[in-house]
Amino acid sequence: MRYLFSSESVTEGHPDKICDQIADAILDALLTQDPQSRVAAEVVVNTGLVLITGEITTKAQVNYVNLARQKIHEIGYTDANNGFAANSCAVLVALDEQSPDIARGVDTAQEAREQLSDAELDRIGAGDQGIMFGYACNETPEYMPLPISLAHRMARRLAAVRKTGQLPYLRPDGKTQVTVIYEDGKPVGIDTILISTQHTATIDDISEESAVQAKIKADLWEAVVKPVFADLTLQPDGNTRFLVNPTGKFVIGGPQGDSGLTGRKLVVDTYGGYARHGGGAFSGKDPTKVDRSAAYMARYIAKNIVAAGLADKCELQISYAIGVARPMSLFVDTFGTGKLSPEQLLELIKTHFDLRPAAIIQTLNLRHLPQERGGRFYQDVAAYGHFGRHDLDLPWEKLDKVADLQAAAAQFLSAV
């Protein structure tokens, strides 16, 4: 069967991604000073305005206004003429402490300790109810679906040629989308490449709109598309459509063009729609929030299963109840590609991975990563995807369980 599948990504200057990065910069700053911080930060941006709200309980001392301005400047919003700039936007802060009704389900006297006993791990519950998914497949070296992998590559390259000055007329806001042709479940071609990028009204001495767009399209093909596909077997061909700014113009962008909000790019953050999503956002949440930590753990498990050769693709669902440590349910699906039965895979998962929230935090070191990485960790995954990142050293991307899973699977298979 032949079909098309599309995934999109956005640049770090997209309004929603500005919010995610500010929220995670706040999280980094708080966890660096106080690894036990409870954080549920939300950010809104609009023309000339940033609102930081949510619930935070911490011993850390952080200047939230300066932190937001620094991140906005780093992203590239430095010119007030564009309707949004780091040094001129208003930054409002409206933060409360975490609700004691929520905290009581997670708090224990032992939580602040580094190594907890099995009984202590059982006493630290999930910070909320919910369902989380993790996914991996062998379509790419990073065990991600090809469409989202390509979309992220292009979004990162689009930002890079702006930041280095290679294409100085580009502005921070941008989106990419790639449509891949599949045949019998395997990617066989590139149907469409779409890039929408904010730009100046004139380029050099070119001011006529169609001429401006023609130059942008030609430049993006050479500076973005070609480098992205340079090391890949699958290439665009004469039948591939290449669309750039299909409306014909993208001068007004960023928060001046659209308001932004944390948690509105969930599919971009994960698997590009190729796998299911539980609905919970990541950015601005400390590791006690299973929306984030359990989704990372589910990816870690799925990736190790696929890398171990136990399936070509694997999706894992985990569910939790607030205040309860052990998952309510665990479901695994290999879409007919598994070397073991679902029951055997579930047994392997339960044997080799501890899915209690406090154990996940310990296994992936989620509280101390900002401190250990010089004050920034979560803000770096807040743009260009939380998974399949070769440019970052992420604990949930490690393949350190492959040998254990292979050995355990061999015992199952030898018993048949």
Swiss-Prot record:
Mg(2+) binds at D16. Keywords: ATP-binding, Cytoplasm, Magnesium, Metal-binding, Nucleotide-binding, One-carbon metabolism, Potassium, Transferase. The gene is metK. This is S-adenosylmethionine synthase. PANTHER family: S-ADENOSYLMETHIONINE SYNTHETASE. Pathway: Amino-acid biosynthesis; S-adenosyl-L-methionine biosynthesis; S-adenosyl-L-methionine from L-methionine: step 1/1. PROSITE patterns: ADOMET_SYNTHASE_1, ADOMET_SYNTHASE_2. CDD domains: S-AdoMet_synt (cd18079). Gene3D superfamilies: 3.30.300.10. It comes from the Bacteria. Binds 2 divalent ions per subunit. Its EC number is 2.5.1.6. Residues 98-108 are annotated as: Flexible loop.
